[in-house]
Amino acid sequence: MAAAADSPIPSQIKGWVYSEYGKASDVLKLETNVPIPELKEDQVLIKVIAAALNPVDSMRMIGFFKVNDTIPTVPGYDVAGVVVKVGSQVKNFKEGDEVYGDLNEEAHEFPKKVGSLAEYNVAEEKVLALKPKNLSFAEAASLPLAIETAYEGLERVGFSAGKSVLVLGGAGGVGTQIIQLAKHVFGASKIAATSSAGKLDLLKSLGANLPIDYTKVKYEDLPEKFDVVFDAIGEPDRALKAVKEGGQVVTIVAPHPTVPFFVLTSTGTTLEKLRPYFESGKVKPVVDPSGPFPFSQAVEAFSYLDTSRATGKVVIYPIP
Protein backbone atom coordinates (compact mmCIF):
# COMPACT_ATOMS: atom_id res chain seq x y z
CA MET A 1 0.00 0.00 0.00
CA ALA A 2 2.90 2.35 0.62
CA ALA A 3 3.34 2.54 -3.14
CA ALA A 4 0.31 4.83 -3.15
CA ALA A 5 2.65 7.62 -2.09
CA ASP A 6 4.29 7.43 -5.53
CA SER A 7 1.07 7.78 -7.54
CA PRO A 8 0.19 11.10 -9.20
CA ILE A 9 -1.99 13.31 -7.01
CA PRO A 10 -5.21 14.29 -8.83
CA SER A 11 -6.91 17.67 -8.56
CA GLN A 12 -10.36 16.09 -8.22
CA ILE A 13 -11.22 12.96 -6.28
CA LYS A 14 -14.04 10.53 -5.56
CA GLY A 15 -15.92 11.10 -2.34
CA TRP A 16 -19.25 10.54 -0.65
CA VAL A 17 -20.96 13.92 -0.33
CA TYR A 18 -24.14 15.29 1.21
CA SER A 19 -25.38 18.72 0.12
CA GLU A 20 -28.48 18.80 2.31
CA TYR A 21 -29.27 17.41 5.73
CA GLY A 22 -30.98 14.06 6.18
CA LYS A 23 -30.27 10.37 6.63
CA ALA A 24 -27.61 8.77 4.45
CA SER A 25 -30.05 6.83 2.28
CA ASP A 26 -31.65 10.13 1.23
CA VAL A 27 -28.76 12.59 0.96
CA LEU A 28 -25.40 10.81 0.63
CA LYS A 29 -24.18 10.64 -2.99
CA LEU A 30 -20.95 9.41 -4.58
CA GLU A 31 -19.29 12.21 -6.55
CA THR A 32 -16.23 12.01 -8.78
CA ASN A 33 -15.29 15.69 -8.91
CA VAL A 34 -14.64 16.61 -5.27
CA PRO A 35 -11.83 19.22 -5.18
CA ILE A 36 -8.81 17.82 -3.38
CA PRO A 37 -8.33 19.69 -0.07
CA GLU A 38 -5.67 22.39 0.01
CA LEU A 39 -2.65 21.41 2.09
CA LYS A 40 -1.69 23.80 4.91
CA GLU A 41 1.79 24.07 6.37
CA ASP A 42 0.99 22.01 9.49
CA GLN A 43 -0.88 19.27 7.61
CA VAL A 44 -0.19 16.12 5.64
CA LEU A 45 -2.07 14.90 2.58
CA ILE A 46 -3.25 11.32 3.01
CA LYS A 47 -4.14 8.75 0.36
CA VAL A 48 -7.01 7.12 2.21
CA ILE A 49 -7.01 3.32 2.42
CA ALA A 50 -9.69 2.75 5.09
CA ALA A 51 -12.18 4.73 7.15
CA ALA A 52 -14.59 4.01 9.99
CA LEU A 53 -18.02 5.43 10.72
CA ASN A 54 -19.17 6.95 14.01
CA PRO A 55 -22.54 8.10 15.36
CA VAL A 56 -21.26 11.68 15.19
CA ASP A 57 -21.10 11.30 11.38
CA SER A 58 -24.82 10.51 11.28
CA MET A 59 -25.61 13.32 13.72
CA ARG A 60 -23.77 15.80 11.50
CA MET A 61 -25.55 14.47 8.43
CA ILE A 62 -29.03 14.99 9.87
CA GLY A 63 -28.09 18.56 10.85
CA PHE A 64 -27.56 18.18 14.59
CA PHE A 65 -24.52 20.48 14.49
CA LYS A 66 -25.76 22.92 11.84
CA VAL A 67 -24.49 25.95 13.72
CA ASN A 68 -20.88 24.73 13.42
CA ASP A 69 -21.17 23.01 10.06
CA THR A 70 -21.18 23.75 6.37
CA ILE A 71 -22.40 21.80 3.37
CA PRO A 72 -21.60 20.19 1.02
CA THR A 73 -19.60 17.85 3.25
CA VAL A 74 -17.70 14.58 2.89
CA PRO A 75 -18.33 12.71 6.17
CA GLY A 76 -15.82 10.66 8.12
CA TYR A 77 -13.60 11.20 11.16
CA ASP A 78 -11.53 8.00 11.41
CA VAL A 79 -8.89 7.48 8.74
CA ALA A 80 -5.99 5.18 7.91
CA GLY A 81 -3.80 5.67 4.87
CA VAL A 82 -0.48 6.72 3.39
CA VAL A 83 1.13 10.16 3.52
CA VAL A 84 1.66 11.47 -0.01
CA LYS A 85 2.65 15.07 0.75
CA VAL A 86 3.72 17.04 3.82
CA GLY A 87 3.35 20.71 4.76
CA SER A 88 6.41 22.87 5.35
CA GLN A 89 6.11 22.78 9.15
CA VAL A 90 5.50 19.04 9.52
CA LYS A 91 8.26 17.37 11.54
CA ASN A 92 7.17 13.84 12.39
CA PHE A 93 5.89 12.41 9.12
CA LYS A 94 7.26 11.93 5.62
CA GLU A 95 5.91 10.72 2.29
CA GLY A 96 5.21 7.00 2.37
CA ASP A 97 4.43 6.83 6.10
CA GLU A 98 1.41 4.72 7.02
CA VAL A 99 -0.69 6.76 9.44
CA TYR A 100 -4.03 6.78 11.22
CA GLY A 101 -6.05 9.18 13.34
CA ASP A 102 -9.22 11.15 13.93
CA LEU A 103 -9.20 13.96 11.35
CA ASN A 104 -11.07 16.48 13.50
CA GLU A 105 -9.29 17.82 16.56
CA GLU A 106 -12.56 19.23 17.94
CA ALA A 107 -15.43 16.95 16.99
CA HIS A 108 -18.19 19.57 16.92
CA GLU A 109 -16.34 22.79 16.09
CA PHE A 110 -16.17 23.37 12.33
CA PRO A 111 -15.08 19.84 11.35
CA LYS A 112 -13.38 19.28 8.03
CA LYS A 113 -15.46 19.60 4.87
CA VAL A 114 -13.61 16.65 3.31
CA GLY A 115 -13.66 13.77 5.76
CA SER A 116 -12.33 10.25 5.45
CA LEU A 117 -14.92 8.98 2.92
CA ALA A 118 -12.86 10.31 0.02
CA GLU A 119 -9.80 9.14 -1.87
CA TYR A 120 -7.60 11.81 -0.26
CA ASN A 121 -7.83 14.15 2.70
CA VAL A 122 -5.67 16.41 4.82
CA ALA A 123 -5.03 16.27 8.55
CA GLU A 124 -2.98 18.23 11.04
CA GLU A 125 0.17 16.46 12.11
CA LYS A 126 -0.92 16.54 15.77
CA VAL A 127 -4.01 14.36 15.24
CA LEU A 128 -2.11 11.52 13.55
CA ALA A 129 0.17 8.66 14.56
CA LEU A 130 2.15 6.03 12.72
CA LYS A 131 0.05 2.92 12.10
CA PRO A 132 1.20 -0.04 14.21
CA LYS A 133 2.82 -2.58 11.89
CA ASN A 134 0.71 -5.47 13.20
CA LEU A 135 -2.59 -3.77 12.35
CA SER A 136 -4.20 -3.74 8.92
CA PHE A 137 -5.46 -0.43 7.54
CA ALA A 138 -9.04 -1.53 8.25
CA GLU A 139 -8.19 -2.39 11.86
CA ALA A 140 -6.28 0.85 12.37
CA ALA A 141 -9.13 2.95 10.97
CA SER A 142 -11.48 1.46 13.56
CA LEU A 143 -9.52 2.78 16.52
CA PRO A 144 -8.88 6.54 16.73
CA LEU A 145 -12.12 8.25 17.74
CA ALA A 146 -13.37 5.33 19.84
CA ILE A 147 -10.20 4.60 21.77
CA GLU A 148 -9.31 8.26 22.27
CA THR A 149 -12.82 8.84 23.65
CA ALA A 150 -12.50 5.83 25.95
CA TYR A 151 -9.08 6.92 27.19
CA GLU A 152 -10.00 10.57 27.73
CA GLY A 153 -13.18 9.61 29.57
CA LEU A 154 -11.35 7.31 31.98
CA GLU A 155 -8.70 9.95 32.58
CA ARG A 156 -11.28 12.67 33.22
CA VAL A 157 -12.83 10.73 36.10
CA GLY A 158 -9.43 9.86 37.56
CA PHE A 159 -9.81 6.14 36.93
CA SER A 160 -6.89 4.18 38.36
CA ALA A 161 -5.69 0.75 39.47
CA GLY A 162 -7.96 -1.02 41.93
CA LYS A 163 -11.15 0.80 40.95
CA SER A 164 -14.28 -0.79 39.49
CA VAL A 165 -16.14 0.36 36.40
CA LEU A 166 -19.51 -0.30 34.77
CA VAL A 167 -19.56 0.25 31.01
CA LEU A 168 -22.97 0.97 29.49
CA GLY A 169 -22.89 -0.19 25.88
CA GLY A 170 -19.94 -2.54 26.23
CA ALA A 171 -20.17 -4.04 22.75
CA GLY A 172 -20.17 -0.74 20.86
CA GLY A 173 -17.27 1.07 19.26
CA VAL A 174 -16.33 3.03 22.39
CA GLY A 175 -17.48 0.41 24.91
CA THR A 176 -15.25 -2.34 23.55
CA GLN A 177 -12.26 -0.05 24.01
CA ILE A 178 -13.26 1.15 27.50
CA ILE A 179 -13.27 -2.46 28.70
CA GLN A 180 -9.82 -3.19 27.28
CA LEU A 181 -8.25 0.05 28.50
CA ALA A 182 -9.75 -0.33 31.98
CA LYS A 183 -8.25 -3.80 32.25
CA HIS A 184 -4.87 -3.53 30.56
CA VAL A 185 -3.92 0.14 30.86
CA PHE A 186 -5.64 1.40 34.01
CA GLY A 187 -5.63 -1.80 36.11
CA ALA A 188 -9.32 -2.04 37.02
CA SER A 189 -10.25 -4.35 39.90
CA LYS A 190 -13.61 -5.20 38.34
CA ILE A 191 -15.22 -4.47 34.99
CA ALA A 192 -18.95 -4.85 34.41
CA ALA A 193 -20.47 -4.12 31.02
CA THR A 194 -23.89 -4.24 29.40
CA SER A 195 -24.91 -5.70 26.05
CA SER A 196 -27.54 -7.93 24.49
CA ALA A 197 -27.37 -11.66 25.22
CA GLY A 198 -25.58 -12.56 21.99
CA LYS A 199 -22.61 -10.33 22.80
CA LEU A 200 -21.89 -11.37 26.39
CA ASP A 201 -19.09 -13.73 25.34
CA LEU A 202 -17.42 -10.86 23.48
CA LEU A 203 -17.51 -8.75 26.65
CA LYS A 204 -15.82 -11.59 28.57
CA SER A 205 -13.15 -12.00 25.91
CA LEU A 206 -12.33 -8.29 26.11
CA GLY A 207 -11.88 -8.42 29.88
CA ALA A 208 -15.28 -7.88 31.52
CA ASN A 209 -15.69 -9.83 34.78
CA LEU A 210 -19.42 -9.20 34.90
CA PRO A 211 -21.21 -9.19 31.53
CA ILE A 212 -24.79 -7.98 31.96
CA ASP A 213 -27.67 -8.77 29.59
CA TYR A 214 -29.53 -5.47 29.66
CA THR A 215 -32.70 -7.13 28.35
CA LYS A 216 -32.96 -9.22 31.54
CA VAL A 217 -31.11 -7.31 34.27
CA LYS A 218 -31.59 -3.75 35.50
CA TYR A 219 -28.01 -2.83 36.23
CA GLU A 220 -29.04 0.05 38.50
CA ASP A 221 -30.76 -2.46 40.81
CA LEU A 222 -27.66 -4.60 41.35
CA PRO A 223 -26.55 -4.63 45.00
CA GLU A 224 -22.97 -3.94 43.93
CA LYS A 225 -22.18 -0.35 43.01
CA PHE A 226 -19.19 0.93 41.02
CA ASP A 227 -16.47 3.53 41.42
CA VAL A 228 -17.08 4.73 37.86
CA VAL A 229 -19.97 4.32 35.43
CA PHE A 230 -19.04 5.16 31.83
CA ASP A 231 -22.23 5.84 29.89
CA ALA A 232 -21.74 5.29 26.16
CA ILE A 233 -25.44 4.90 25.31
CA GLY A 234 -27.26 7.85 26.89
CA GLU A 235 -28.68 6.62 30.21
CA PRO A 236 -27.20 9.08 32.73
CA ASP A 237 -30.13 8.95 35.18
CA ARG A 238 -29.92 5.18 35.48
CA ALA A 239 -26.13 5.38 35.61
CA LEU A 240 -26.33 7.63 38.68
CA LYS A 241 -28.16 4.85 40.54
CA ALA A 242 -25.35 2.36 39.80
CA VAL A 243 -22.42 4.42 41.07
CA LYS A 244 -20.96 4.24 44.57
CA GLU A 245 -21.32 7.16 46.93
CA GLY A 246 -18.36 9.35 46.07
CA GLY A 247 -17.97 7.65 42.69
CA GLN A 248 -18.28 9.27 39.28
CA VAL A 249 -20.40 8.96 36.15
CA VAL A 250 -19.24 10.20 32.77
CA THR A 251 -21.32 10.30 29.59
CA ILE A 252 -20.45 10.89 25.95
CA VAL A 253 -23.97 10.94 24.54
CA ALA A 254 -25.71 14.09 25.76
CA PRO A 255 -25.24 16.82 28.36
CA HIS A 256 -26.86 16.19 31.76
CA PRO A 257 -27.31 18.57 34.72
CA THR A 258 -25.33 16.39 37.17
CA VAL A 259 -23.24 14.07 34.98
CA PRO A 260 -19.96 15.18 33.39
CA PHE A 261 -20.25 15.26 29.60
CA PHE A 262 -17.30 15.75 27.30
CA VAL A 263 -16.50 16.02 23.63
CA LEU A 264 -13.24 14.42 22.55
CA THR A 265 -10.20 16.51 21.72
CA SER A 266 -8.43 14.35 19.16
CA THR A 267 -4.67 13.87 19.49
CA GLY A 268 -2.18 11.49 17.98
CA THR A 269 -0.32 11.54 21.30
CA THR A 270 -2.90 9.18 22.80
CA LEU A 271 -2.49 6.74 19.92
CA GLU A 272 1.29 6.82 20.34
CA LYS A 273 0.96 6.29 24.10
CA LEU A 274 -1.18 3.20 23.48
CA ARG A 275 1.02 1.79 20.69
CA PRO A 276 2.71 -0.83 22.96
CA TYR A 277 -0.70 -2.23 23.90
CA PHE A 278 -1.70 -2.52 20.23
CA GLU A 279 1.59 -4.11 19.23
CA SER A 280 1.47 -6.62 22.10
CA GLY A 281 -2.12 -7.54 21.25
CA LYS A 282 -3.38 -6.64 24.72
CA VAL A 283 -5.69 -4.00 23.25
CA LYS A 284 -7.35 -5.06 20.00
CA PRO A 285 -9.46 -3.37 17.35
CA VAL A 286 -13.04 -4.64 17.22
CA VAL A 287 -14.44 -4.47 13.69
CA ASP A 288 -18.06 -5.41 13.16
CA PRO A 289 -18.22 -8.82 11.42
CA SER A 290 -20.73 -7.51 8.87
CA GLY A 291 -17.86 -5.56 7.30
CA PRO A 292 -15.64 -4.14 6.20
CA PHE A 293 -18.02 -2.52 3.73
CA PRO A 294 -16.54 -1.62 0.33
CA PHE A 295 -16.39 2.07 -0.60
CA SER A 296 -19.33 1.62 -2.97
CA GLN A 297 -21.56 0.56 -0.06
CA ALA A 298 -21.09 3.57 2.22
CA VAL A 299 -24.84 4.24 2.29
CA GLU A 300 -25.52 0.66 3.38
CA ALA A 301 -22.81 1.00 6.02
CA PHE A 302 -24.47 4.11 7.44
CA SER A 303 -27.86 2.40 7.45
CA TYR A 304 -26.34 -0.44 9.46
CA LEU A 305 -24.58 1.95 11.85
CA ASP A 306 -27.86 3.76 12.47
CA THR A 307 -29.53 0.56 13.72
CA SER A 308 -27.27 0.85 16.82
CA ARG A 309 -26.70 -2.91 16.56
CA ALA A 310 -23.11 -2.84 15.36
CA THR A 311 -20.48 -4.70 17.33
CA GLY A 312 -17.38 -2.56 17.63
CA LYS A 313 -16.81 -0.32 14.61
CA VAL A 314 -18.29 -0.17 11.11
CA VAL A 315 -15.36 0.07 8.69
CA ILE A 316 -15.15 1.11 5.03
CA TYR A 317 -12.37 -0.67 3.12
CA PRO A 318 -10.84 -0.51 0.59
CA ILE A 319 -11.05 3.12 -0.52
CA PRO A 320 -11.82 3.64 -3.33
Which residues are covered by each model-predicted region?
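Eukaryotic N-terminal low-complexity, Ser/Thr- and Lys/Arg-rich leader segments
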Residues: 1-22, 320
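Short, well-ordered loop/turn sites that connect or cap secondary structure elements
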Residues: 93-94, 159, 243
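C-terminal hydrophobic helical "lid"/dimerization subdomain
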Residues: 3, 271-320
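Glycine-rich beta-strand-centered segment in the early N-terminal region that forms part
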Residues: 35-53, 64-106
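Mid-domain Rossmann-like dinucleotide-binding core that forms the NAD(H)/NADP(H) cofactor-binding site
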Residues: 139-216
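NAD(P)H dinucleotide-binding glycine-rich loop of Rossmann-like/cofactor-binding domains
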Residues: 102-169
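Glycine-rich cofactor phosphate-binding loops and adjacent beta1-alpha1 units
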Residues: 166, 192-195, 201-262, 268
